[in-house]
Amino acid sequence: MNLGIYRQGLRFCQCGYDGSNLRPLGEFTGSGHPSFHHNGRWGITDCYIQECFTAPDRSIPLRLIDLGTNTERALTRVDITTPGLARSYNFRLDPHPVWCDNDNFLIFNAMENGARRVFLADMRKFQ
């Protein structure tokens, strides 16, 4: 999850089911909708359109977080500009990247050719 702990902006955090043992996961800037691999090493997240990760063309990165090496990289940038976004922020598209149950694939939302789509990304090389 993302939390604004230590008054240093959003950070990725982890805690027990009851809220105990709250701790940040590395020094990464938190954003969007994080999801973590069952092996505990890999995280994936998107960002909101108003955050610093958004490009001038309004595409946003899918950020792969490596807790094993304390590094991150953008796997890809996705278009989230919906036809209704100019009228209302409520018409935005959030990618919400998540790991599949078998941890071999990511599922995320994005725009393609003016239409909302659901994508599946093969992540087996990151096992």
Positions of PLM-derived features:
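Blade-terminus and WD-like Trp-Asp/Gly-His loop motifs, strongest in beta-propeller folds
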Residues: 1-2, 34-45, 97-105
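Beta-propeller blade-edge and WD-like acidic-aromatic loop motif
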Residues: 4-24, 48-80, 104-105, 109-127
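Conserved blade-ending motifs and adjacent loop-strand segments that build the rim/top face
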Residues: 23-37, 70-99
